[in-house]
Amino acid sequence: MKTTHLVLVLCFLAGVAQTTLALKEEDCEVCIKTVRRFAASLDDAIKGDYKQIETEFKKFCKTQKNKEHRFCYYLGGLEESATGILNEMSKPLSWSMPAEKVCEKLKKKDAQICDLRYEKQIDLNSVDLKKLKVRDLKKILNDWDESCDGCLEKSDFIKRIEELKPKYARSEL
């Protein structure tokens, strides 16, 4: 009787440990979102063949930018990629493994895959520009493909952003 209770308790604890160790979306957001988007773009005819999945992933990577492009580089989906662990993604996808599990396997092979993070968007309607760093102010202008010629001081960048704000900032209704 005591042995069965002990076995049940151990099984329960193992299950709890397994769910707490599972990869969460915020722990590996770029990988999970990219793998989900890629898997959703695949035709049913391709989903079972890992070689075709790899070919499609290389095509998919040619259109990616920023963090997704870096993710493709890490996996070996780009011509200039130094390493290639593409089969660590394509084979599990061919078995219909969920994106979280695929990224968990990829993280074991290359931890930097889960170091990729999307940059947090700044809400220009509620943020106090004076409290932002100059680097963040420059990033706002860069995201808008705008420049600030002659800007030296923080106040110069703030003034330029305020001038352009009506053109780029979305107002909530």
UniProtKB/Swiss-Prot annotation:
Task of the protein: Required during the maturation of the embryonic nervous system for maintenance of neuronal and cuticular connectivity. Essential for maintenance of dopaminergic neurons and dopamine levels.
Compartment(s) of residence: Secreted
Residue pairs linked by disulfide bridges in the UniProt entry: 28-114, 31-103, 61-72, 148-151
Keyword flag Secreted: yes
GO MF annotation list: calcium ion binding
Pfam families for this protein: ARMET_C, ARMET_N
Any one cellular-component term (Gene Ontology): endoplasmic reticulum
Stored Gene3D superfamilies: SAP domain (1.10.720.30), Saposin-like (1.10.225.10)
Keyword annotations of the record: Developmental protein, Disulfide bond, Secreted, Signal
InterPro entries membership: ARMET-like, ARMET_C, ARMET_N, EF_Hand_1_Ca_BS, EF_hand_dom, SAP_dom_sf
Secretion signal, residue range per the UniProt entry: 1-22
Organism: Drosophila persimilis (Fruit fly)
UniProt-listed GO biological process terms: dopamine metabolic process; dopaminergic neuron differentiation; neuron cellular homeostasis; neuron projection development; synaptic transmission, dopaminergic
Main location: secreted
Similarity field: Belongs to the ARMET family.
Domain of life (superkingdom): Eukaryota
Protein name: Mesencephalic astrocyte-derived neurotrophic factor homolog
